[in-house]
A protein has these predicted regions:
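Tryptophan-centered motif/residue detector
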Residues: 6, 33, 71, 78-79, ...
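Feature captures the FAD/FMN-dependent oxidoreductase FAD-binding
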Residues: 35-104
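Rossmann-like dinucleotide-binding core of oxidoreductases
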Residues: 1, 91, 98-226
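Residues in well-ordered beta-strands of folded domains
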Residues: 26, 81, 123
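Residues that flank catalytic or metal-binding motifs in active/ligand-binding sites
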Residues: 2, 21, 65, 76, ...
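Beta1-alpha1 glycine-rich phosphate/pyrophosphate-binding loop at the start
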Residues: 1-60, 165-168
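Residue-level detector of flexible, active-site-proximal loop/helix-junction positions
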Residues: 29, 67, 73, 87, ...
């Protein structure tokens, strides 16, 4: 199934930190986004629709592992050794793009006592939706992008919440909003609105990228955040 990280991650509050208009293909803009910042189910649905609409899904070999890749100088081709289940295969390609999606696999830390812990334990990328956190004492290890999203979602229902972090990140309120049916209908009828908004968002993010390369330029933002 297509989706990558948006297929694997289903924790409470899972979504994108980039506005939906930009976090989509320029050749496949959508008027279906319910919020300015899309949620995980919507992004997964969008990726599935795009893969089907453009005939990509039928070309994907799911469950296939790339075991070896070697460049054949004589033929100017890549020789790819693959494995699907117990069946091995070989393919030739002019171009190879490594898009292995490393963040689709949960990275479990090596912590003392982890193996002997008797309570419920799971990674945010392998969220146990059958386990009710209501009234529980919960410890969250790490404050990456996932924790920033799910901690506010579970905090109101748990009895105690302890968050352990190595480095505290700066977190600003997300300027999200419900787009509503009227906005979606308007975008569908006048695609130029979304295209213009997409360009505006891209420009603003490019300004932020400049600030990341030149930290002094972000000092006003840092001051406002404090």
């Amino acid at each position: 199934r297509v989706g990558g990280t948006w297929r694997e991650n289903t924790y409470p509050g899972c979504g994108c930190d980039v506005p939906s208009s930009l976090y989509s293909f320029s050749f496949a803009l959508s008027s279906k986004w319910s919020h300015l910042f899309a949620r995980q189910p919507e992004i997964l649905s969008y990726l599935e629709e795009v893969s089907e609409d453009f005939g990509i899904k039928e070309l994907i070999e799911f469950g296939t592992e790339l075991e070896h890749a070697e460049w054949d100088e004589r033929r100017h081709l890549w020789v790819l050794d693959t494995k699907t289940g117990e069946e091995k295969g070989q393919s030739l390609a002019r171009t190879v793009v490594f898009a292995t999606g490393p963040i689709t696999e949960a990275q479990i830390p090596s912590l003392p006592g982890l193996d002997s812990f008797k309570g419920e334990m799971f990674h945010s990328a392998q969220w146990n939706h059958d386990y009710d956190l209501t009234g529980k004492r919960v410890a969250v290890i790490g404050t990456g992008a996932s924790a920033i999203q799910f901690v506010p979602q579970i905090q109101p229902k748990v009895k105690e919440l302890h968050v352990f972090q190595r480095t505290a990140p700066w977190v600003l309120p997300k300027p999200d909003m419900d787009l509503g049916d009227t906005s979606k209908q308007l975008i569908e009828k006048l695609p130029i609105i979304q295209k213009s908004w997409r360009k505006a968002v891209a420009t603003s993010l490019n300004v932020i990228n400049f600030g990341l390369r030149n930290p002094a330029a972000l000092q006003p933002v840092s001051t406002a955040a404090k």
